Amino acid sequence: MTTAAAILRQKSTAFNYVHPQYNVLEAIRLLSSLNRSFLVVMEEGEYKGIFTEHALVQKMATPGWQAAEKTVADVMDTKLPAASIDSSRHEMMQLMISHHTRYLPVFDGYRFAGVISMNNLLKAMLYPSFSLEEFFASPRGDFDAALQG
């Protein structure tokens, strides 16, 4: 059984953190420069939420909403369901589907352990015969290269 801990071990350990008071425009630039769709929001070593492209687009659709005047705290998702490091990929998929989210923060007790995306879960489910480490290590997450080992 593939658990959250197993998926996190095989992902890059580098998470992209941002402070809740960071300006939204700067956060957008950071997302773009890193080619990421989310940033983990941390304050004094404590998980606060996730800043996502999806949440940003929803806020920007609000009439009169000005990104230049907003902080990450104004946009971040704080009520996402969470998984434990022992959660199975099936449990995590159920959480994502039932809560309409693409990201799950993962905790080891009360300690933030990382984020698992829908994409991470799909890779783990569709390609269980090869190491996720091989997949994540390939330049663009190349399925064919990872399958060939």
Feature roles, as predicted:
Residues 17-35, 42, 82-100, 107, ...:
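The conserved cystathionine-beta-synthase
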